[in-house]
Amino acid sequence: MRKNRSAAVAAASFLLVTGAAIASAPSAYAGTPGGTHANDRNTDFNGDGYDDVLVGSPGAAVGGYKGAGMVTVQYGGPKGMGTTNVRAFSQNSSGVAGAAETGDNFGKAVATGDLDSDGYDDAVVGIPGEDIGAVSNAGGVVVLWGTPKGLTGSVSNWLQADDLTTSGRFGTALAAARFSDTTPGDLLAVMDSVGLTTYQFEPATEPGAKSVGPQSRQPQQKARTTLTSPPKTALARSGADEPPGIQPKSMTTGDYDNNGYADLIVSGTSVGDEPGHGWSYILPGTASNDEPLPVTAVRGGPVVASGDINGDGYDDLVTGEPHSPDDGGESMTGGMVGVYYGSSAGPAGQEGPGTPPVWWTQDSPGVPGTNERGDGFGTDLSVGDTNKDGFADLAIGVSGEDIGTVPDAGAFIVLRGAARGLTSTGALSANQGTTRVPGTVEKGDKFGGQVSFTDPNDDGRFGLLVSAPSENTNDGFVWVFSAGTGGITTSGSWSYGASAFGGPTADALYGAAIDD
């Protein structure tokens, strides 16, 4: 049973303004670390051992309010996921904090993690368009607690910025993992338009016991930092004298130095004299009694994902730059993806830490397609082992890909992992015109807008979810691709939208966010 669950922001020692790692001073809890490596899945809301799927539909009309937004959870099982064992939540659902309003965009961002260490993963939903009082688009976050029955929404926690600002968009991106040993649960990172806040929740009194619902409380302590100015204590990598400030866009987590604690990546695009370039800050996770490690910055972003591509036990960092200038800033490309391989010193480039990543484009040998302006190669990324060979594979969204003469129809590409790293051998590319893929190639669908590996039947082979949020004039659809001994296959693929479970469809943008 959960008792007296209150939220407290993790101590400020990890913040970029100090240049220290993610660690905090309170005495450590005993317990097995969870959620440290990228493949430590944390999407099991009912504790049955099967991954569940959390999908955001931020454009959904709820109670007549356009763009109020909703999320759905599809529960995994021996036969995988479907459209029958589904729950939908909005701010009009009983127990969910707030109320549905026009333009709230509930579900614009989603994340999962066991925040209270009770054995049931929890769902975190970003609401960046939330108006609070007279402050428009201040943003907010709702935590839906996992139970033996899954997500119930009977009680939820509400989080918001300490200092409300117009267009602050608190909840723009979310991530949860075990960054330190200050609590047995996962810490929650919440991004807004300029910075980052982390939250720590008290552990459940009786881990694994049947939940009767937590007490909903506001955070007791708060710590903040902005990222739009260069952190003075951050160490630059990848050929820059000083890392720039960034407009933060996304986050990912992984144990890149394999020290037993997750590291947090905050990614965005540069601001200042040379705007628009992708950069990512690495905030290392450490034990609370260890000397904090310095924050470092590497080229690449604003899209990021993590996983062990070469099977060496270190998570690797993958960055996507779908619309940014190339390294020289002289021309636009169709997008590029960078791979930093994990090491004892954290993510390392081609020649070790502090060097550029291994760059991939559609002009790289063996990669399907051709590098063309507007392709959006790297629109979204996901890393997972699709054939159970011990090497994680990389899914790449190419949402701006033209299919024949149809502009921006979209596609996805899967590159395989291997002992030597990412390889184009055995690469797969598919779109709505590919044999056995449901649907029709249409202008502006942006198929590949989201890609997410998931293993809802727990067979060790990660299938792939691919969304086209613009499908059917912004209604949105999600495609399900299974995995076999050869990895991802289009055989047996199927698709669904919000109508499959009676949800609102018009301009719903279903699949605009999928937890990864």
PLM segments and residue spans:
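Blade-edge motifs of beta-propeller repeat domains
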Residues: 2-9, 14-39, 75-105, 145-169, ...
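Beta-propeller blade termini
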Residues: 32-51, 56, 107-120, 171-181, ...
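Acidic/hydrophobic-patterned starts of short beta strands in beta-sheet-rich repeat architectures
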Residues: 47-56, 117-128, 181-191, 258-267, ...
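Hydrophobic strand positions within the blades of repeat-based beta-sheet folds
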Residues: 53-55, 71-74, 89, 106, ...
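Short glycine/acidic-enriched loop and turn motifs that connect beta-strands
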Residues: 59-64, 129-134, 194-196, 269-274, ...
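A detector of repeated loop/turn-to-beta-strand junctions in beta-rich toroidal repeat architectures
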Residues: 66-70, 83, 122, 135-140, ...
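Mobile, glycine-rich extracellular loop/lid and propeptide segments
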Residues: 102-116, 120-130, 135-146, 158-160, ...
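Core solenoid repeat modules with strong leucine/isoleucine-rich periodicity
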Residues: 252, 259, 264, 303-307, ...
